[in-house]
Amino acid sequence: MMTTTDLFLLNATNVAQTQLSGLEPWLNALQRQQWQQIKQPRRRQEFLVSRAVLNRLLTSHLGQDPQNLHFYTGPHGKPALTGPGQEHCHFNLSHSGDWLVIAIGDQGPLGVDLELGRRARSPLPLAQRFFAAAEYQYLADLPQAEQNSAFYRLWSRKEAVLKAHGGGIAAGLDKVEFVPQQKWCLLNHLDGVDYRVHDWPWQGGWLSLAGRTSDVHLHQLDECLEIMTGQPHLDKNP
């Protein structure tokens, strides 16, 4: 088993047409049925790319044939693998804007979240409603120009933990609290697990990963779905 977690970043709208035409065979029967039911072209391409690339990456990671991948969906909607020799492999994916991110690793449940949104209005009312009181106060004390980025950084970190837990946002954003003034220390009121949370500025937003490992490798796929050499060009961390 691998002791690292790999993150794969891809612009799902920038995949070459020659690659798109060859992705359908990578879908399993259920995925193909779901894909065929999608009418909106952008959403249809996004679904095809995300599921086909996920299956390709899992096949490579496990060293198994794609038809042997067996998925199930947890009680709160989180997908996982259940086939022979696959239970140790954990994965998670997230979309935002044009971008897709897939996390794969063997060291326990993973949660990944990508937030590229920009709010025209102040994020403080949302933070007051969904965040812990101390987090709201942290945002309120920041200069107005910094509040938007800090809000999405908090949201991304929180959602990554909630996805690793498996309950998603319904489990409660306020149950996962961060203390930015203490190196973004996690106060986990949800399940007590000591998740290791990493984040990176990406495309003007934030990418966060929650899991059990501190060794994370980032990769970017090009329009031909090949891994690009070198590290992805991350934004400067504010």
What positions do the PLM features span?
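Core catalytic alpha/beta fold that binds nucleotide/phospho-ligands
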Residues: M1-P238
